[in-house]
Amino acid sequence: MIARWSAILLLLPIGALAQQKDEIRKSVYFDGGSYYIDEYQVDELYHWLDSIPNILEKFEIQLISHTDPIGGKQYNEWLSKMRGEAVYELLLQKEIPESIIHRKDWGLDNPVYSNDSYRGMMMNRRVDVILHPVVF
């Protein structure tokens, strides 16, 4: 299921994810009610991180986790935290220092996509990994 995200992402309107100037972002997607990251997504994330030269010197990393509204606010706050933690652990395994990783768990608040459709809910089940340039 998750391996099909690449095709789905091609269908998104340009600018669907508002991006700040100079930031670089990648999303890790999840099945409903899950914080499991499949091998395909792990490989995609690691490949993306490896493709960015001098990542540890040039960027700080922000993790922003999201959910769809199914299950209610309290459940989704927990699920969002678990999704953020799962991606955080992958970054630590990649030897990225804790000191440059910052987290925000939104839960079902602030969805980027409409939760009125299955597709929108599917796209809201994610953790955005955002690289912000370090300003000297």
Task: Name these PLM-found stretches.
Residues 67-136:
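Periplasmic OmpA-like peptidoglycan-binding domain that tethers envelope proteins to the cell wall
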Residues 18-20:
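Boundary of Sec targeting at the N-terminus
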Residues 25-29, 64-69:
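A short small-residue
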Residues 4-15:
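Sec-dependent N-terminal signal peptides
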Residues 30-64, 129:
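Periplasmic peptidoglycan-binding/anchoring modules of Gram-negative envelope and division proteins
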Residues 24-26, 33, 57-59, 99, ...:
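Envelope-exposed proteins and targeting segments
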